[in-house]
């Protein structure tokens, strides 16, 4: 907005005529802009719910152009009055033309200063009214110095769209060349720097310089009255106390603000085993963790520096720990079930106890000695067969002992069941001859009673015994033949033994 001092004079009639013509052209352009914006608004009126921001921007732009159009119309009237006054005799009076911030008006002023021949370039953008392009601060300062002081009314007429104090600070810090898109700068507390900036740019303020200075003083007083006004993230009162009562100083440009020292924090309480033991003893005295209070526990512990909060925190942790279910010990593993031999089968002990009662048939283990004795007898005679062939006297003595008749049975035992006869027969086992003939003599009775009372296992045992007895008979027959051939001296004893054996079998 650079302008010469000739703008303030009244002796240039051509200049006034050019300004009037330029304002007429600007009025026509503004009307065209308004008509175009109205057409655009009608186009998107059906979509105003989907495009609320577009409608808002169009309405604001149209309102701004209407205000400028009114200002131009008022300006044209003032220009006509000024032209009429110029034709009258020269009167020395101060005349300040009404100017606006629009870019088109500035271009018209420049064209009029250059001679009025050039026409300003069109910048058909409704955003001009929002001051997205700002003039340099130096040109504004020069123009302000040329114009001199202004009254609040004139200032409001010259600057209908003034900016806020925050934008003033941003423009001053950025040099005024960044436009609307300026980097963010934090608002510091009111100080000498902001006061100087406000004094350097009085035309950008909302109030005159005197009122602005008073407002700055009042704002500084309010900052002093606030005891906890934050300054750069730190409480001002605490910083003032750290500086010894001095107010916080504003750092110079280019220097980093040193971070404030952190306040000393109290060390965390470390509960040693001894301290915890005292804690547990106090709980036992007071009646448990659910009844005791932190104050009572602290008084009983008698520890210097221990606070109720620390005891309370430890008590809560202790309650949580004791409330947690303790891991139960692992149950003892069940002993390996013992197995008992019952009838040749490995069975659990409970079945053995049930089988301990009276059984219909005899238990199998009772027959085990019979097999062992039979095998032992067979092996014995097999090993000594050759010895008996060469010693007839010893053979006759052994045979006589083996076939000796057993004592007679009592009458009540003569009609015993078949298995008792079987056990008596097994008791008489002494020699192969007696076994064979005894088995042969009682074979009929065993066979007749097997179908009625004997089980399958006892029948199988009887069959095995019969086979063993047959083998023993063959061996004893061979032995008797050998004795008969060896000598005539022993024939009498052999005959006697044979007769005795026959009597035992018949018996």
Swiss-Prot record:
Residues 139-172, 238-268, 402-507 are annotated as: Disordered. GO terms for cellular component: nucleus. Pfam families: Myb_DNA-binding. Residues 456-476 have a biased composition (Acidic residues). Keywords: DNA-binding, Nucleus, Transcription, Transcription regulation. InterPro entries: Homeodomain-like_sf, HRS1-like, Myb_dom, Myb_dom_plants, SANT/Myb. Residues 152-161 have a biased composition (Basic and acidic residues). Residues 437-446 have a biased composition (Gly residues). It is found in: Nucleus. NCBIfam families: myb_SHAQKYF. Probable transcription factor that may play a role in regulatory networks controlling development and metabolism. This is Transcription factor NIGTH1. It comes from Oryza sativa subsp. japonica (Rice).
């Amino acid at each position: 907005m650079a302008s010469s001092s000739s703008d303030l004079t009244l002796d240039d009639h051509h200049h006034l005529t050019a300004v009037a013509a330029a304002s007429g052209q600007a009025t026509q352009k503004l009307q065209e802009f308004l008509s175009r914006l109205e057409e655009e608004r009608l186009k998107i009126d059906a979509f105003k719910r989907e495009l609320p921001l577009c409608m808002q921007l169009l309405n604001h732009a149209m309102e701004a152009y209407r205000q400028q159009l009114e200002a131009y119309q008022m300006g044209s009237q003032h220009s006509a009055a000024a032209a009429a006054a110029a034709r009258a005799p020269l009167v020395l009076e101060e005349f300040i033309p009404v100017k606006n911030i629009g870019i088109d008006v500035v271009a018209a002023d420049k064209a009029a200063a250059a001679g009025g021949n050039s026409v300003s370039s069109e910048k058909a953008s409704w955003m001009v009214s929002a001051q997205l392009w700002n003039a340099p601060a130096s040109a504004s300062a020069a123009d302000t110095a040329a114009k001199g002081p202004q009254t609040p009314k004139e200032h409001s007429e010259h600057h209908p769209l003034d900016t806020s104090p925050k934008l003033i600070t941003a423009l001053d810090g950025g040099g005024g060349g960044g436009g609307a898109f300026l980097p963010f700068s934090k608002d510091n507390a009111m100080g000498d720097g902001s006061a100087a900036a406000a004094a350097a740019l009085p035309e950008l303020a909302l109030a005159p310089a005197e009122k602005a200075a008073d407002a700055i003083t009042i704002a500084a007083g309010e900052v002093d009255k606030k005891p906890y006004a934050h300054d750069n993230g730190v409480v001002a009162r605490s910083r003032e106390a750290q500086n010894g009562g001095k107010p916080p100083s504003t750092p110079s440009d280019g220097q980093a603000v040193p971070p404030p020292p952190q306040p000393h924090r109290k060390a965390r309480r470390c509960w040693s085993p001894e301290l915890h033991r005292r804690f547990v003893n106090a709980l036992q005295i007071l009646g448990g963790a659910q009844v005791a209070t932190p104050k009572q526990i602290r008084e009983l512990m008698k520890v210097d520096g221990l606070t109720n909060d620390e005891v309370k925190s430890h008590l809560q942790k202790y309650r949580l720990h004791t409330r947690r279910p303790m891991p139960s010990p692992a149950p003892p593993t069940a002993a390996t079930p013992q197995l008992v031999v019952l009838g040749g089968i490995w069975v659990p002990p409970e079945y053995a106890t049930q089988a301990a009662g009276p059984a219909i048939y005899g238990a199998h283990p009772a027959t085990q000695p019979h097999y062992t004795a039979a095998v032992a007898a067979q092996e014995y005679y097999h090993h000594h067969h050759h010895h008996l062939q060469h010693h007839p006297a010893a053979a006759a003595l052994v045979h006589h002992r083996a076939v000796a008749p057993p004592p007679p049975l009592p009458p009540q035992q003569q009609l015993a069941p078949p298995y008792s006869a079987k056990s008596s027969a097994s008791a008489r086992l002494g020699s192969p001859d007696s076994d064979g003939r005894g088995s042969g003599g009682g074979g009929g009775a065993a066979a007749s009673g097997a179908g009625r009372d004997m089980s399958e296992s006892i029948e199988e045992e009887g069959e095995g015994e019969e086979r063993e007895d047959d083998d023993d008979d063959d061996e004893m027959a061979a032995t008797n033949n050998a004795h008969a051939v060896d000598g005539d001296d022993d024939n009498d004893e052999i005959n006697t033994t044979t007769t005795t054996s026959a009597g035992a079998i018949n018996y």
